[in-house]
Amino acid sequence: MLVHVLFFISAIASAPSSAFSLKALFGGDENSGSSDLSNGTDITVRQPLLKATDWFLTEQEITDSRGGIPRTDLSVYTTGNAVTSFTVTNEFYDSVYEDLAKTKEGDRVLLSAYATALVPLKPDVDPTGAKTGVGKVFTDVVNRGGSINVLNWQNLKYRKFNLKARDTINAIPMSPINEAKAVLLFDDRLPTIVSSYHQKTLVIASNSSSDKDAHPVAYVGGLDLANDRWDTIYHNNSAIRDASGISFKNQGWLDGHIRIHGPAAKDVANNFVARWNSDYLPSQSIKDDLLDFENPPYEHIPPINYASSNTTATLGKQSIQITRTFSCKYEHYKEFAPRGENSLFQARLKAIKNAKNFIYIEDQYFILVPELLEAIMEVMPTIQRLIVVANPQTNPFSNAGYIKYLYEMVSPIREKYPNKFKIYTTKADRKLMIHTKVVIIDDVYLSVGSANWNRRSMTSDPELNAEVVDAETVKSPEGVTVGKLPRDFRIRKFMEMTGRSYDELDAMTFNEAANQFAVAASDSSTILANLEIEHHAYFFVITDTIRKVSDPQDTCTYT
């Protein structure tokens, strides 16, 4: 039966009329009389909410997101963090290298990874990785007396790179100073066979500190120390990427990440330590032996030990709430999420409903999550614009139906608000990967992390995001007060998309800047293109049964 279904999809999809729309046949013109034709210019800009507590989940809301189990190992939110943002990937790798190169005796490196490869962190100056390669940098950390712990997903796509990284990292000799060592473990503690261990964090911490002003550093976002990722804002570095072994499946990479110095970094560290120390061991099945994913013997690691506050600091002006996803259907998160956690999902819903003026989404996917669609439709009448940048879905077989779920997310918004809502991608001939997982609302709220815009990231796969609100404010061209860091992040992303300068975009209202996307999409010198999304006749064959496998929504009820 499945063979017949796949053949049927293939036959329809390959036909010249593959863009045939059932809606066109049976009615339902996308520009019907019920559409709101406003382009946002007729809507008065409103002062956005500025208080972090207006955006963040309350302690009770976090508890509710965990099936009624309080979250005791992470703060509700933290203040006084110093955040550095990276809108282009080489910025991230330069910063990671500098931080790792400064580690000293007793320091700890905790890396949570979707994939790890022995790539150079600075391929533009060190293409062979002789000085900045992941293996060399980790060896230097251990030689100086630092320890390294890596939790890496059993990633089949990057298997050969992961195995090589595992073998190299686990073979690093113990430190001659204090016997510190490096250990990489493959982690398969997931709800289903198609799940991903998706958290992407890096923590650099002291073994202990009695300084009441000292705090660790953490990186949170969409990037791994892996192939394909290193790139610049111009996405024209094929020669460097090829010469250094960076290139894998793409010719460039878009992403987002932040560096946190402050108490929020402790939350990121605590998340890692709890996973590492779980009594349920990873990679214990015969599959792991067959695929060479077996792990070495290892020990529990101590929690980080700082005398400074777990909730406040004076290092910067940014307030941060760490949000997560752990499936409520997986029984082996008992130490840290016995009923799962979907605080990330709940935080996104709350933030969208707070929108006063605009929402900017840049994500690997933009597929149907019914609750997120409902929240967007709730605020669309009163905001000026919704701008989305995402990858196209061009094949019914890739991602098991994501082409349909993209249409289902886009169509209701586009039909009702054809001028307020615009969706873009990158030009196909550039062969770029949009891997970003970023939401910016009103230039006040920035969400960045590992979670994609799909159901599995919201409810099933292990994910970790940082929700950021900046107490340092600036006046926008519209005359309202906004957060300095979220606005700066957004402008730098718009530079990447449109090719316009920072100063030009800084002087524009959001509507004016958003209009530059349409200009850039028709300009061959930019990376941007319109994302064309159509209904296809074969969509009815992509059933909810398929969706429950490729994009599960894990929900549980407790009494």
Segments predicted by a language model, with ranges:
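Classical eukaryotic N-terminal signal peptides for Sec-dependent ER targeting/secretion
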Residues: M1-F8
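N-terminal signal peptide
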Residues: I9-F26
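Extended rod-forming repeat segments used as scaffolds/tethers
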Residues: A11, D231, D470-E472
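HKD-type phospholipase D/PLD-like phosphodiesterase module
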Residues: L25-F26, G33-R108, A115-N354, E362, ...
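Long hydrophobic segments that form regular secondary structure
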Residues: L344-I361, Y365-L372, M377-Q384, Y558
